[in-house]
Amino acid sequence: METRGRRRAFSHQQDEPEENPGKRPTRSAPLYRHRNQPNANPATLERHYPCSTGRPPTGTVQPKPSQPPQPRSLLDRDAIDHITELWDRLYLLRQSLEKMTMADGLKPLKHFRSLEELLSLGGERLLQDLVKENQHVRSMMNEVTPLLREDGSCISLNYQLQPVIGVIYGPTGCGKSQLLRNLLSTQLINPPPETVFFIAPQVDMIPPSEIKAWEMQICEGNYAPGPEGTIIPQSGTLLPRFIKMAYDELTLEQNYDVSHPDNIFAKAASQGPIAIIMDECMENLGGHKGVSKFFHAFPSKLHDKFPKCTGYTVLVVLHNMNPRRDLGGNIANLKIQAKMHLISPRMHPSQLNRFVNTFTKGLPLAISLLLKDIFQFHAQKPCYDWIIYNTTPEHDALQWSYLHPRDGLMPMYLNIQAHLYRVLENIHKVLNDRDRWSRAYRKRNK
């Protein structure tokens, strides 16, 4: 009864002292203990339990803020592939520039001696820039791929460009007449003409063998191989017409008027595409009689008047890139209106250099010198090859191209070469800055 009637001590009160006054009192009970605490006699806590109710917390109350994704290592497999691919291209371009005969006028560019040195000493920023540069080079290569065949050659010389006004420069014996026939027989002119006008100073100057070669090759260019050994016509006629004309017949007054009933070009244009070939007519073009109408005004009128005339081609042969005699301004106007310049590497170097200097204003000096070196290299070869400049190309990579009798029409990718040269200049700048900082550091710590 005494036990039941005894008052219960509160948790904040100290235990009653024992009878022995000399004995030290025991430690007081904990100030606070959670009801879910598994230990019945826990150690004394000098602070409150962090959780007031429920189970003990398993994590922080406030979630961590979202962090941006960490970038991948620059030396992963894709990055190394990009840098290796770009290194091969840069090495080839650098070797070509160093070995060409005109390399004396170029400033030397600092570079890494090997790919391993680039990967180890290039630095994070430079390696990242090189990866981006190679991705850009790949994109430029992929853009031009639909315009090429499987072997890398061009599908066409003009693609959808109309009218086709071309000038062929070459000395005697470089294969200009054969080039004219090959352009039509290999279907590099799109669409293939149904009527070909061959203009010469005199009709008697054309040998019978050349006439027969023209008739055979324009017929060959009118067909393409089909399935199961068949051939498919590429125009609206089975046999294209070949018409021989003297230069004096070309300049008749009736042929300047599209609406004239006796205009021979209008009659042919009413049936389909036409082509006008002027061979050995440089002296006649330099006379007083103007024929520049056939280069600019005539094509648009034929296209408007005759819907079947979907193609208009004019190819003019010149033996000199800068003839002195041009009384009527025909040659000067022809060069302005020309969309394509087909140049033989056997032309005089002074004329080639003048042409390259005029039409490579947007390219680095090193690429212009490289183009001149290409002309000089092919001038020493016996092949009947040509270098073509297109003023309005389908793609920048096709602005300069190389025509070989066996390989076909191959793009020269001078836009990509110019981009690679700028990458070489960037590497030179990085290495030059490092050398300057190293010299400044050594000078300061002396």
Curated annotation (Swiss-Prot):
- Return the annotated region ranges for Disordered: 1-74
- Residues recorded as binding ATP, renumbered to this chain, are 170-177
Q: What subcellular compartments does it reside in?
A: Virion; Host nucleus, Host nucleoplasm; Host nucleus, Host nucleolus
One GO cellular component, as annotated: host cell nucleoplasm
Please list the GO terms describing molecular function: ATP binding; DNA binding
Induction (UniProt): Expressed in the intermediate phase of the viral replicative cycle.
Extract the InterPro entries matched here.
Adeno_IVa2, P-loop_NTPase
Its GO biological process terms?
DNA-templated transcription; nuclear capsid assembly; regulation of DNA-templated transcription; viral DNA genome packaging via site-specific sequence recognition; viral release from host cell; viral transcription
In its UniProt entry, what is this protein called?
A: Packaging protein 1
Q: Which organism is it from?
A: Human adenovirus F serotype 40
Gene responsible for this protein: IVa2
